[in-house]
């Protein structure tokens, strides 16, 4: 038998089968840097319609984790998909650079500011440290293949940005949304500073649970509130608390106006007593206190008890009964001990009754010297002493432990307290900010849609935002206030601008260096500088003003999109919304997209302590960034995002399918010159015309999916196209034609033209997701092209089939269904040992008239569609159990038999004319025509 390999057009390409991504990707990054690709993209798309995704700044501290990677990859997929869709989509990454975690790090290195080191030097070290962290994180983000202006990012520590943050504060102040108040705020005793709601996270904490009695100050007066009071023994009201440390600050008890209270006779240690408790809570209170025998000896409502007084359990302090809407019957006694220093509701109800705070704690959570019994003790450690004192005074009725959800600092992970201090607030209601924000929320597109309900609920319940911090490393609240009244200077707008100009030159140190006399003149003796700094959520929250509107390449408000993790409804989305509405009266974003957290296969949050964490660096070093990017695209980001080693392996398999399909296409067009070999669309063979139409249709679907941020659909459709329509059908069918026909024949060039169109489109479809691989593929596609795929838009060489085409979409859909049924029958026959490969067989198709029409339309080329050596069509009435088997396709039976003919040594088909030609005894007539003659002709497949 002769070797005919040299007569075949076999696929050939230098495009590697193995991705070898961990080695190739860094080389690609270097090339992108060398050619200044990001800058070239900006130049190429200059003047087109803009799409602005505004980057929520990660905190400049520590290595990036998987959550960071997910966030940046999602942003990059969107920015690149908008670019390929023809938008000018610049991406300016940012970093949040002020605040407590950086202060803590620097404190461990050089000591506390004002103690071991001067404030200016401390701020210099903080700046230095933050910039080091930015450099580290930037390297990892770039390694992910994320495009952006990485070496001109926005940093909240940039002098210009710091100045613009101060300007934004000035605008909010002059628009009347700012107020100074003495209110309880979340306070970190570890950090010695106030915290905003967004900096609070809730974790389980085990606390002391105690019931305490407050004796009546005037029993006779108190009992007059009960119309039918009887019984004997001392009268007291019972409170329940899980924060014994707040009792030194207890100034009142609160009751519900409409709640029914019971005067209850009981006996404790043989002594008769009468307790006042909400009647509905009586059973649970008595059970907690170990009292079995009791009876109600009087009833009244909370309203009846208003103004009655009790005595503090261990101080000589009169405790009035107040009415408060916050009192519920969910737990406790229906009576709430009220400490205005340590709770918003407590503060509000005391404020209504004219009861002032007493400020018993210092910044570090230590009781001041004037606090009787507990001076010098720390809130974290004082509970046992408080309980001991209550026991000694006979006021402790029960003591247990309770595990409950408790506020913790999201940075230091330590429990928070409420502490009343003078602070600066953005008022939610003074100028109607809450209502305006709620109205703006409705105009924004929220992805997923439940995000709208979530942020609406948060804004509805949001307290005034405490924006002041008692820290060293932060943007100053650059105001002058009157020494006596604490009112803002009447010329605040001008003064803020003067300060901002100085900060623009030398940074936030300018505020501390400014001489008040230089700005205020004679007024300086009556005014003082505010020494507080801004909440870091204010820094990032005003980047719509300090960055979006300031950067020339962005230059628009609102942004098209904000994209962050789902925790940012209470964080950056909310702080940005409040400040934008306060300054501009508008939301800072048109769309908001949120993604879920990363979890392991069991749904557990990833953490080092659990040992289930997967670091992005580990994935990139082992599998490559493109595998991580593909996992992000293939995962539903609207819920928790599950990742494990098994999932990564499956993702790598999917990647190989896309890569191998691309490689096969490249191998098939290796000698193709699109300038001279391209076949006109109308001249393509029917099957080739169909695959181009299918690619056109898919491209339209992918454009829509990208536009809707439905990357799972993009992944599924592309993967399905590669594995089913290309891999299992089209590329399988055309092998014979492409390999065996004359290279310059219409049949061969038509197949190459179609594949050229497909790879040109496919490479663009995957570029936003598989960025490294797409760029690699791009460099192997024949023909002149731009130096990067990322300078291109969606491929315009695809065309849909004309409506009503004889062999249109419906025709090929019907044929594919028949082919699937034939393949199944062939597989069953092969498994049963009746036949070998499909080319050793001939098939008989017994079909309905309509189906016969479809099948006969392909004439002699029908066998190529089934990859069999013969295919005959008969009426379904000619079928029998002996000559065919039923199929899933209604009206179709298939007969399969081994061919009796010899095998062609070149095309491997079994044909009756093999050996009929003397010059080539082992070839079929078709192959001889393709070698020695003018070549076979095909019309369809």
UniProtKB/Swiss-Prot annotation:
Keyword Metal-binding: yes
Primary subcellular site in the record, as a coarse category: cytoplasm
Keywords tagged on the record: Aminoacyl-tRNA synthetase, ATP-binding, Cytoplasm, Ligase, Metal-binding, Nucleotide-binding, Protein biosynthesis, Zinc
Disulfide bridge positions per record: none
Binding site for L-isoleucyl-5'-AMP: 564
GO cellular component terms given for this protein: cytosol
Cofactor binding note: Binds 1 zinc ion per subunit.
UniProt binding sites for Zn(2+): 904, 907, 924, 927
Molecular function via GO: aminoacyl-tRNA deacylase activity; ATP binding; isoleucine-tRNA ligase activity; tRNA binding; zinc ion binding
Subcellular location(s) per record: Cytoplasm
Sequence motif 'HIGH' region, location on chain: 58-68
Cofactors (names): Zn(2+)
Segments carrying motif 'KMSKS' region: 605-609
E.C. numbers: 6.1.1.5
GO-annotated biological processes: isoleucyl-tRNA aminoacylation
Catalyses which reaction(s): tRNA(Ile) + L-isoleucine + ATP = L-isoleucyl-tRNA(Ile) + AMP + diphosphate
Binding-site positions, ATP: 608
Alphabetical list of HAMAP family matching this protein: Ile_tRNA_synth_type1
Comment field on protein domains: IleRS has two distinct active sites: one for aminoacylation and one for editing. The misactivated valine is translocated from the active site to the editing site, which sterically excludes the correctly activated isoleucine. The single editing site contains two valyl binding pockets, one specific for each substrate (Val-AMP or Val-tRNA(Ile)).
Function field: Catalyzes the attachment of isoleucine to tRNA(Ile). As IleRS can inadvertently accommodate and process structurally similar amino acids such as valine, to avoid such errors it has two additional distinct tRNA(Ile)-dependent editing activities. One activity is designated as 'pretransfer' editing and involves the hydrolysis of activated Val-AMP. The other activity is designated 'posttransfer' editing and involves deacylation of mischarged Val-tRNA(Ile).
NCBIfam families: ileS
Similarity comment: family membership: Belongs to the class-I aminoacyl-tRNA synthetase family. IleS type 1 subfamily.
Subunit comment: Monomer.
Name the UniProt record assigns to this protein: Isoleucine--tRNA ligase
């Amino acid at each position: 038998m002769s070797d005919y390999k040299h007569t075949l057009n076999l696929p050939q390409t230098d495009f590697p089968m193995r991705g070898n991504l961990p080695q190739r990707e860094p080389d690609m990054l270097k090339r992108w840097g060398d050619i200044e690709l990001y800058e070239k993209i900006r130049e190429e798309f200059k003047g087109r319609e803009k799409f602005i995704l505004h980057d929520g700044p990660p905190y400049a501290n520590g290595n990036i984790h998987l959550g960071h990677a997910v966030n940046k990859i999602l942003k990059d997929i969107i920015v690149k998909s908008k670019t390929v869709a023809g938008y000018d989509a610049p991406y300016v990454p940012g970093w949040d650079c002020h605040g407590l975690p950086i202060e803590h790090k620097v404190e461990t290195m050089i000591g506390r500011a004002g103690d071991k080191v001067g404030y200016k030097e401390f701020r210099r070290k903080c700046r230095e440290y933050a910039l080091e962290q930015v450099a580290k994180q930037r390297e990892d983000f770039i390694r992910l293949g994320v495009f952006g202006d990485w070496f001109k990012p926005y940093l909240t520590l940039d002098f210009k940005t710091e100045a613009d943050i101060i300007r934004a504060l000035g605008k909010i102040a002059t628009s009347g949304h700012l107020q100074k108040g003495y209110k309880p705020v979340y306070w970190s005793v570890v950090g010695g500073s106030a915290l905003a709601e967004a900096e609070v996270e809730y974790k389980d904490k085990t606390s002391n649970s105690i019931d305490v009695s407050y004796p009546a100050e005037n029993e006779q007066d108190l009992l007059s509130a009960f119309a039918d009071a009887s019984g004997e023994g001392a009268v007291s009201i019972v409170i329940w608390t899980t924060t014994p440390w707040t009792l030194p600050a207890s100034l009142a008890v609160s009751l519900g106006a409409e709640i029914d209270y019971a005067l209850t006779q009981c006996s404790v240690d043989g002594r008769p007593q009468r307790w006042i408790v909400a009647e509905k809570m009586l059973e649970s209170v008595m059970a907690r206190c170990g009292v079995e025998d009791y009876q109600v000896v009087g009833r009244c409502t909370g309203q009846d008890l208003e103004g009655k007084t009790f005595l503090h359990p261990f101080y000589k302090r009169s405790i009035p009964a107040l009415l408060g809407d916050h009192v519920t019957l969910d737990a406790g006694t229906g009576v709430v001990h009220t400490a205005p220093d340590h709770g918003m509701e407590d503060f509000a109800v005391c404020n209504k009754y004219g009861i002032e705070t007493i400020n018993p704690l210092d910044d570090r959570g230590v009781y001041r010297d004037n606090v009787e019994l507990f001076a010098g003790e720390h809130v974290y450690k004082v509970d046992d002493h408080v309980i001991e004192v209550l026991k000694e005074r006979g006021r402790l009725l029960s003591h247990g432990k309770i595990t409950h959800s408790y506020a913790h600092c999201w940075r230091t992970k330590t429990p928070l307290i409420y502490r009343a201090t003078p602070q600066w607030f953005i008022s939610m209601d003074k100028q109607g900010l809450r209502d305006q924000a709620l109205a703006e929320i409705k105009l924004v597109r929220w992805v997923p849609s439940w995000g709208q309900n979530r942020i609406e609920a948060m804004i509805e319940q949001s307290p005034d935002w405490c924006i002041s911090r008692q820290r060293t490393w932060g943007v100053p609240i650059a105001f002058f206030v009157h020494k006596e009244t604490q009112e803002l200077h009447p010329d605040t707008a001008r003064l803020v601008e003067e300060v901002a100009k100085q900060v623009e030159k030398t940074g936030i140190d300018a505020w501390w260096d400014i001489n008040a006399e230089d700005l205020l003149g004679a007024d300086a003796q009556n005014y003082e500088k505010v020494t507080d700094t801004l909440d870091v959520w204010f820094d990032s929250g005003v980047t719509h003003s300090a960055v979006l509107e300031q950067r020339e390449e962005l230059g628009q408000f609102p942004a098209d999109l904000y994209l962050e993790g789902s925790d940012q409804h209470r964080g950056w989305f909310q702080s940005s919304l409040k400040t934008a509405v306060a300054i501009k009266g508008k939301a800072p974003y048109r769309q908001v997209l949120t993604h879920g957290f990363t979890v392991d296969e069991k749904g557990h949050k990833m953490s080092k302590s659990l040992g289930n964490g997967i670091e992005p660096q580990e994935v990139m070093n082992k599998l490559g960034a493109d595998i991580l990017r593909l996992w992000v695209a293939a995962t539903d980001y609207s819920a928790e995002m599950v990742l494990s080693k098994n999932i990564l392996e499956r993702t790598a398999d999917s990647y190989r399918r896309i890569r191998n399909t691309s490689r096969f296409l490249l191998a098939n067009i290796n000698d193709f010159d699109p300038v001279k070999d391209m076949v006109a669309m109308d001249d393509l063979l029917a099957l080739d015309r169909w695959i181009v139409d299918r690619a056109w249709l898919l491209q339209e679907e992918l454009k829509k999916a990208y536009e809707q941020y439905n990357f799972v659909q993009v992944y599924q459709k592309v993967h399905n196209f590669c594995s089913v329509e290309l891999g299992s059908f089209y590329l399988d069918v055309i092998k014979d034609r492409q390999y065996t026909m004359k290279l310059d024949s219409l049949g061969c060039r038509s197949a190459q033209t179609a594949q050229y169109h497909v790879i040109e489109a496919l490479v663009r479809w995957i570029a936003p997701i598989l960025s490294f691989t797409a760029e690699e593929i791009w460099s192997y596609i024949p023909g002149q092209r731009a130096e990067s795929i990322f300078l291109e838009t969606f491929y315009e060489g695809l065309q849909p089939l004309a409506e009503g085409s004889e062999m249109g979409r419906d025709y090929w859909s019907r044929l594919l269904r028949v082919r699937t049924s034939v393949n199944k029958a062939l597989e069953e026959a092969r498994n049963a040992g009746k036949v070998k490969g499909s080319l050793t067989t001939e098939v008989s198709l017994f079909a309905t008239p309509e189906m016969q029409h479809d099948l006969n339309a392909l004439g002699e080329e029908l066998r190529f569609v089934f990859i069999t050596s013969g295919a005959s069509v008969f009426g379904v009435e000619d079928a029998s159990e002996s000559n065919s088997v039923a199929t899933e396709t209604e009206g179709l039976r298939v007969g399969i038999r081994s061919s009796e003919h010899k095998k062609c040594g070149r095309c491997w088909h079994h044909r009756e004319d093999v050996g009929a030609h003397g010059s080539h005894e082992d070839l079929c007539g078709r192959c001889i025509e393709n070698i020695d003659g003018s070549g076979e002709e095909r019309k369809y497949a």
